[in-house]
Swiss-Prot record:
<dbReference type="GO" id="GO:0000978">
    <property type="term" value="F:RNA polymerase II cis-regulatory region sequence-specific DNA binding"/>
</dbReference>
<keyword id="KW-0805">Transcription regulation</keyword>
<dbReference type="GO" id="GO:0005829">
    <property type="term" value="C:cytosol"/>
</dbReference>
<protein>
    <recommendedName>
        <fullName>ETS domain-containing protein Elk-4</fullName>
    </recommendedName>
</protein>
<dbReference type="GO" id="GO:0000122">
    <property type="term" value="P:negative regulation of transcription by RNA polymerase II"/>
</dbReference>
<keyword id="KW-0539">Nucleus</keyword>
<feature type="compositionally biased region" description="Basic and acidic residues">
    <location>
        <begin position="299"/>
        <end position="312"/>
    </location>
</feature>
<dbReference type="GO" id="GO:0003682">
    <property type="term" value="F:chromatin binding"/>
</dbReference>
<keyword id="KW-1017">Isopeptide bond</keyword>
<dbReference type="GO" id="GO:0005654">
    <property type="term" value="C:nucleoplasm"/>
</dbReference>
<dbReference type="InterPro" id="IPR036390">
    <property type="entry name" value="WH_DNA-bd_sf"/>
</dbReference>
<feature type="region of interest" description="Disordered">
    <location>
        <begin position="245"/>
        <end position="279"/>
    </location>
</feature>
<keyword id="KW-0832">Ubl conjugation</keyword>
<dbReference type="InterPro" id="IPR000418">
    <property type="entry name" value="Ets_dom"/>
</dbReference>
<feature type="cross-link" description="Glycyl lysine isopeptide (Lys-Gly) (interchain with G-Cter in SUMO2)">
    <location>
        <position position="166"/>
    </location>
</feature>
<feature type="compositionally biased region" description="Pro residues">
    <location>
        <begin position="249"/>
        <end position="272"/>
    </location>
</feature>
<dbReference type="InterPro" id="IPR046328">
    <property type="entry name" value="ETS_fam"/>
</dbReference>
Amino acid sequence: MDSAITLWQFLLQLLQEPQNEHMICWTSNNGEFKLLQAEEVARLWGIRKNKPNMNYDKLSRALRYYYVKNIIKKVNGQKFVYKFVSYPEILKMDPLTVGRIEGDCEALNSIETSSSKDVEYGGKERPPQPGAKTSSRNDYIHSGLYSSFTLNSLNTSNKKLFKSIKIENPAEKLAEKKAQEPTPSVIKFVTTPAKKPPIEPVAAAFATSPSLSPSSEETIQALETLVSPTLPSLETPASISILATTFNPTPPVPSTPLPLKEPPRTPSPPLSSNPDIDTDIESVASQPMELPENLSLEPKNEDSALPEKDKTNNSSRSKKPKGLELTPALVVTGSDPSPLGILSPSLPTASLTPALFSQTPILLTPSPLLSSIHFWSTLSPFAPLSPARLQGANTLFQFPSVLNSHGPFTLSGLDGPSTPGPFSPDLQKT
């Protein structure tokens, strides 16, 4: 027997064989039949399909598939009783089953196609659909249409693709090589100039440092709102001089060489007639006196004659400086024999607070003094009482009383370098 037979065809075959009447039999002439020995029929169906564990439960579930296909239906109220939906037409399928059993495959295919056409014209019975589908599929596969179509399409498409790839690949490679060759040179030309411009602004800043003085008032006003306690550290003395001209208010903690390099460019014009300072530093600072003169803003016109006299006198004889301007974060005692001992590397710094001196550089030019006073006035809780706020940014603030006095004086707010307080009220007179 053929294992490709369907379940409804197997049942119809058993009904047509008289030796199987003890297992299955017709109950009426309208296509009803009953399974007398349901388990035996299920066992035979399992042998046909090579499923030894077949039973009636599985067989009944398989019959439900034909309920949907409208081939077999269950008779209500009767156990093991089923019915072929279109019984007269279902008998025409007997030659198919017999042909399958005998092995006449060619006759089977022809009969299936003819029966499927008859069923389609009838419109009621659909049993031959599975057979018709298989036969039509087999006919389509064995015919030359399927194979010739796919092979021809693949051959033509492959030839075209291979030709196009062989022609286009060298051109694409050449185009990519040409496009990639100029790129390294372009990158080199772009990157090599980019490394040099950072050096140019430093030289330009040195060249144009005197021209920055007219905009000092605007820079002070901008720094009042934008200044912060922590700014990037200054690495070279040249950057410190630039910041002094632009009134940068917060010089951070410099390294140890910075206080040693500052004295040559920080001697101030004499403002009083009190010679109390050693002459060693004056001889060292005689050469770079021109830079503070160029960097000073408004006091240049007022005290221009005094630095010139100092220059002439320094060449002939040693003359002691007359005044010393200090930042608000310094304490000078009267017992110190040399007030400028802090500037020489060999002399001890016993007259100063070491922490304050390491964090606050000494600026002897008038313009950095104004900037530092103005900056500390912005941080002070008594900002309206600070001298820079009272006299404004247009006029240069000086301390004649402090510079002319010989006695020791202290500045308030020396507890920490970050929060210095304002000057005492007596310092604001005149």
